[in-house]
């Protein structure tokens, strides 16, 4: 059986790994075996944190909406507001509502008043 020399292929693979790990510190940026381990760990963390980021942003949007709703006393709480939002068939998601809450509060109050008109006064409290 003939010998297969793969120096250039292995070097190309290691160079690619070294360029990925160029911002790592100490041995994690220099040693090939440590680089491969850190590369696996970094890609795993990136995949996990992409899912966590979605959860964190949703939590942030809910907090912003809830704070603004309770501030003026438009509704008692966030869950009642969202429930009445879906009952009145207004198709606004949490991200858009949070952006409206930050940029234009009066617009969110107008949305809340529309919900109150459609659903009724028994579910909301107006101050």
UniProtKB/Swiss-Prot annotation:
This is Large ribosomal subunit protein bL20c. Belongs to the bacterial ribosomal protein bL20 family. Binds directly to 23S ribosomal RNA and is necessary for the in vitro assembly process of the 50S ribosomal subunit. It is not involved in the protein synthesizing functions of that subunit. InterPro entries: Ribosomal_bL20 (IPR005813), RIBOSOMAL_L20_CS (IPR049946), Ribosomal_protein_bL20_C (IPR035566). It comes from the Eukaryota. One of its GO terms (biological process) is ribosomal large subunit assembly. The lineage of its organism: Eukaryota, Viridiplantae, Streptophyta, Embryophyta, Tracheophyta. PANTHER family: 39S RIBOSOMAL PROTEIN L20. It comes from Jasminum nudiflorum. It is found in: Plastid, Chloroplast.
